[in-house]
């Protein structure tokens, strides 16, 4: 069982230095427009994913006129107390630690604090293209399966290399099909793992959705 007991924000978005305590299992956040309700939720997202829900650029989350941010959360995970701290240094370097133990790779943290975001643009999962649905599914499976995330990282990196190679074919006229074959072969292992895990999840999940829909 996971529970967030408190969170402290330093120079995060519109917060100069502010702390919030969450004493109940269910918490409602209310306030006038512009006071920072969504920013508070985004700070919680930061503790779960080490990034903002809204932007990939960490600098966009720094309070205007300042440098660096610090987000600290006090958690209870399976009856044990944990302190999670995310720091963006003045140099732009980002650090994340749980109980003062820093991660070598941020991907090691994903799934430790499961997080579900419900937002108006979720309608895109139904009305939008398949890319939005794949992204949603990937985010969910990465929290459930660390190995899935590692395969996904490798797969995306190879796809980038493959696309760059195809672009060079067009720009230079030099067609290195041997290298293209190597990249295609490297895609097989992570691609099969990703496909199988997506299929496995959907076989389990779709009957539940159909039952709720009916």
Predicted regions and their residues:
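Pre-Walker A-like glycine/lysine-rich segment at the N-terminus of P-loop NTPase domains
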Residues: 1-46
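Short hydrophobic/aromatic segments of transmembrane alpha-helices and their interfaces
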Residues: 3, 43-44, 114-117, 184-185
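Generic alpha-helix structural propensity
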Residues: 24, 35, 39, 56, ...
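ABC transporter nucleotide-binding domains
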Residues: 25, 43, 112-114, 136
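Short amphipathic alpha-helical segments enriched in hydrophobics
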Residues: 44, 48-52, 166
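Nucleotide-state sensing region of NTPase/ATPase domains
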Residues: 49-126, 130-132, 141-144, 148, ...
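An accessory alpha-helical subdomain
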Residues: 121-212
